[in-house]
């Protein structure tokens, strides 16, 4: 009799994706982040669902409903802080996952990579709208500032902003629609994840060497299921440490003040995971230029396959490119720091230099050094 795992129409899909999937034997812990992102998405959907049972998307009661969740709902504080800090964990895993893809040349799987970029944009949109829902000062002013950026689009900008707001300012209509979008987007993300995996399984996984590994594949289960479970336990440990010991570490104190359209906070800034893009936005004095730089700071990932001039896929054996990659990483940390600083000297010039360096490394230095490495290896 045939094994049900291999014959049942539904179970065999799961079997080919997570059990009998041929996997390169040498993939390192950097390949754990895909499964961790799946776990993060699951945690966010579950905690979000329970929060939505008690939350009210009305300007008069939104802030109070969040307070009610934390004070009166059974384990409400735990659910709320797991959701808020779960978003931070989600982005840490996302950045590491993208960084892994850049380092080991995984962007050469073009369809998988492009779906990944769409996923990154969707997750960022979801997180932004979720931040608005608690209706604190930073939520309100963050929503006002970020949605206002669309007014930089020539001709249709102002109309577009008012259409998104559902009025002439961020108000009840905005909050209600943001709640609607914030609820539906994670399910769209889950669907995109399936497409992402579908394209990945067409080609098979990349590996640290960047070489073809068809001759040395092992089944995903039990080897990588156990490895992923270890990663998951570490993720949960880190998340719960953050939630139970310092849940407000990554939040903004201003968000404990109810939204007030008549009082602007001295420094408007988004959550930490958007600070690098916010720093790039602020580094350009022109509004439209800033918005374009903001979009291209992430969209630039899409042209990485075009800029691959090296004869080796991975950076594993390319010390010059490795050096550049870590300079780029340090530059992103610098941008994140600058994004949280006030707009004054010397932060303005540091932000501008860091932004120039970010685009220069990706567009100029990485391709140039790749060609140089080819020459040095006499290829």
Swiss-Prot record:
Cofactor: heme b
Keywords: Electron transport, Heme, Iron, Membrane, Metal-binding, Mitochondrion, Mitochondrion inner membrane, Respiratory chain, Transmembrane, Transmembrane helix, Transport, Ubiquinone
Compartmental location: Mitochondrion inner membrane
Membrane topology: Multi-pass membrane protein
Additional detail: Heme 1 (or BL or b562) is low-potential and absorbs at about 562 nm, and heme 2 (or BH or b566) is high-potential and absorbs at about 566 nm.
Function, as annotated: Component of the ubiquinol-cytochrome c reductase complex (complex III or cytochrome b-c1 complex) that is part of the mitochondrial respiratory chain. The b-c1 complex mediates electron transfer from ubiquinol to cytochrome c. Contributes to the generation of a proton gradient across the mitochondrial membrane that is then used for ATP synthesis.
Family: Belongs to the cytochrome b family.
Protein name: Cytochrome b
Gene name of the encoded protein: MT-CYB
